[in-house]
C-alpha cells in the first residue's frame, strides 16, 4: 500500500512537472504581426506591426517569453517622412543603444521603404532618423545581422511589387548603424515562386542560415509557413532545406505561421517568436505572437522541437512562470492620459482624445475625402466578448460603440442627437440598420460579439437590465468583410461630427467569454 501511495505521488509530481513545461500559444493575445524580440539581461522586449493604427509599433516586455505586458510604442505620432502602412519593425541592441528598423510608406510617393529610430532604452523614447533603405519600388521587412567578425548587415525583401521574382537582399551597415555602405547584393531569389519575405539570419559553425516565410501572409486564405536555407558564404549561393517548410500550420489549431525572429534565453535555449493565425473563431483575433523552440539537427539544418506541424501547445522556456490568462478591459477615464492599450485610425482622422473629470472626450478632423469619423479602439484578445459604454455628451455629434475595420468598413452603434442608431458601412456604402427614438436620455450601450462577429445590440437605462434591438439581414459574410486584408476589426468608441462638439463617454468595457 505504501509503495502504491509513493508511486502515485511520484506520478502526480511528474505530471505537474510535465504540465509546467508546456505553454499555450498565443503568448501575446491580439493582432501583433511580424514580431521582433530581443533579450536585455533577463528581460525580453518585443514589438510588431501596427499597420493603419496609431500609436505605431507597440512595445511589450516579459521576464519569461510567455507573460507579456504592453509598455509603450516606438512612435506616438508618425515620422515626418512617412504616411501609412507601419509594418515589420526589427528591434536591435547595439553597443548599449536600441535601434528599430521599420517599414513605412513614404509620404512623397507611397512607396514602402525602411527607416530607423534610436533610443537609449528599449522602451524608448525613440528618435526617428529617417529612411535608411530606399531601394526599387519597395523595400520591406528589415533584419540586422552581426556576422561575428565585426561586420553588420541589413537585409530586406525587394521587388515584391514588380513583374519579376522576389529577392532577399542585403547591404553592409555603416558604423553609425544609420546608413548603408557599398552596393546591395542578392541573398536569395524566389525562382520557385513560393513568395519570400520575413527573413532572419544567423551564423553557426561553417554556415550562414536564413529562415524566411513563404506563401500568403494575410487574410482568410493565409497559408504562411517557414522555410530555411544555408550557405558557407554570406553572399551565397544558398541551398534550400530539403525538409521545407520546416514550420507550417494547416491543422485544427494553427491556420498559418511565420515572420519572426530568434532569441536565446539565459539557459541557452533558442526560441522563434513569430505570428500565427489561429484556426476557428480566434482567427478573427488576427495574427497573434507565438513561440517555438528551435534546435539544430544532426544534419546541420534548423528544426523546431515538436516537429514542423505548428501547434498551440509548445515546450515552455526554462524557468517560465505560470502562464496568465486573458483579462477583461475596463477604462473609467480617471487618469489624465489614455491607457497604453488604446489605438486610433490615424490615416482617416486627426483624432483628439482627452480624459477629463472621469470622462473621455473624443473628436476628430477627417483627413481624406471619404473619412468621416474618429475611432478609438483596442485589440480584441478573444473572438467572443461584449463591449459596452455610456455616451454622456450633450451634442448633436454621433457618440457610439464601433467594430472598426477602416473608413469604408465598420459597424457603428450609438446616439446621434436623440436617436439611437445602428449603421453598417461596407465597401464605402452606408446602410442604417436601426433608427429609433432614444429610450432614455443617456442609455448604456452594449454589442455582443461571438466568434468575431457582432450578434446583438442592446441598451439599458441602468447598466443592469438590457433590452435587445431586433435586426434582420446582417449576414455573416457582410460581418466578416469588415476585416481588412492585413488586420482585423477592432472594438472601440466612435465620434462623428464637428471637432468642436466632441463625443463624451463615461467608461468603456470589454468582457471576454
Where do the model's predicted regions map?
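Carbohydrate-active catalytic/glycan-binding domains of CAZyme proteins
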Residues: 19-513
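Bacterial N-terminal signal peptides that target proteins for export
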Residues: 1-9
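Hydrophobic h-region of N-terminal signal peptides that target proteins for export
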Residues: 10-19
Amino acid at each position: 500500500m505504501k509503495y502504491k501511495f509513493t508511486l502515485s505521488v511520484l506520478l502526480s509530481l511528474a505530471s505537474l512537472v510535465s504540465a509546467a513545461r508546456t505553454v499555450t500559444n498565443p503568448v501575446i493575445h491580439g493582432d501583433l504581426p511580424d514580431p521582433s524580440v530581443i533579450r536585455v539581461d533577463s528581460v525580453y522586449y518585443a514589438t510588431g506591426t501596427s499597420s493603419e493604427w496609431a500609436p505605431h509599433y507597440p512595445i511589450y516586455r516579459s521576464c519569461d517569453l510567455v507573460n507579456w505586458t504592453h509598455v509603450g510604442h516606438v512612435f506616438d505620432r508618425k515620422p515626418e517622412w512617412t504616411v501609412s502602412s507601419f509594418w515589420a519593425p526589427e528591434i536591435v541592441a547595439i553597443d548599449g543603444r536600441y535601434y528599430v528598423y521599420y517599414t513605412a510608406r513614404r509620404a512623397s510617393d507611397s512607396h514602402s521603404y525602411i527607416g530607423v529610430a534610436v533610443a537609449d532604452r528599449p522602451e524608448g523614447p525613440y528618435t526617428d532618423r529617417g529612411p535608411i533603405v530606399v531601394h526599387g519600388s519597395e523595400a520591406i521587412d528589415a533584419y540586422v545581422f552581426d556576422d561575428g567578425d565585426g561586420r553588420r548587415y541589413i537585409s530586406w525583401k525587394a521587388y515584391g511589387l514588380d513583374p519579376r521574382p522576389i529577392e532577399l537582399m542585403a547591404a553592409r551597415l555603416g558604423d553609425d548603424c544609420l546608413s548603408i555602405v557599398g552596393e546591395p547584393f542578392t541573398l536569395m531569389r524566389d525562382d520557385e515562386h513560393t513568395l519570400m519575405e520575413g527573413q532572419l539570419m544567423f551564423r553557426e559553425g561553417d554556415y550562414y542560415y536564413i529562415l524566411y516565410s513563404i506563401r500568403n501572409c494575410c487574410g482568410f486564405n493565409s497559408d504562411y509557413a517557414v522555410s530555411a536555407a544555408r550557405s558557407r558564404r554570406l553572399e551565397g549561393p544558398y541551398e534550400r532545406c530539403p525538409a521545407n517548410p520546416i514550420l507550417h500550420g494547416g491543422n485544427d489549431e494553427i491556420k498559418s505561421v511565420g515572420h519572426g525572429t530568434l532569441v536565446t534565453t539565459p539557459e541557452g535555449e533558442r526560441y522563434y517568436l513569430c505570428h500565427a493565425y489561429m484556426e476557428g473563431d480566434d482567427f478573427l483575433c488576427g495574427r497573434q505572437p507565438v513561440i517555438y523552440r528551435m534546435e539544430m539537427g544532426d544534419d546541420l539544418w534548423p528544426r523546431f522541437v515538436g516537429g514542423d506541424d505548428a501547434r498551440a501547445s509548445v515546450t515552455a522556456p526554462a524557468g517560465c512562470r505560470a502562464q496568465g490568462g486573458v483579462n477583461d478591459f475596463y477604462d473609467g477615464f480617471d487618469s489624465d492620459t489614455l491607457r497604453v492599450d488604446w489605438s486610433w485610425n490615424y490615416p482617416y482622422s486627426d483624432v483628439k482624445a482627452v480624459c477629463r473629470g472621469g470622462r473621455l472626450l473624443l473628436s476628430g478632423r477627417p483627413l481624406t475625402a471619404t473619412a468621416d469619423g474618429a475611432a478609438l479602439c483596442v485589440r480584441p484578445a478573444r473572438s467572443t466578448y461584449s463591449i459596452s459604454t455610456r455616451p454622456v455628451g450633450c451634442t448633436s455629434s454621433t457618440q457610439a460603440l464601433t467594430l472598426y475595420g477602416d473608413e469604408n468598413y465598420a459597424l457603428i452603434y450609438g446616439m446621434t442627437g436623440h436617436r439611437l442608431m445602428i449603421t453598417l458601412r461596407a465597401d464605402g456604402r452606408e446602410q442604417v440598420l436601426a433608427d429609433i427614438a432614444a429610450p432614455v436620455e443617456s442609455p448604456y450601450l452594449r454589442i455582443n460579439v461571438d466568434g468575431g462577429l457582432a450578434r446583438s445590440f442592446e441598451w439599458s437605462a441602468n447598466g443592469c437590465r438590457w433590452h435587445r434591438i431586433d435586426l434582420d439581414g446582417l449576414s455573416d459574410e457582410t460581418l466578416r468583410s469588415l476585416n481588412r486584408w492585413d488586420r482585423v476589426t477592432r472594438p472601440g468608441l466612435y465620434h462623428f461630427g464637428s471637432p468642436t462638439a466632441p463625443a463624451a463617454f463615461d467608461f468603456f468595457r470589454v468582457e471576454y467569454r
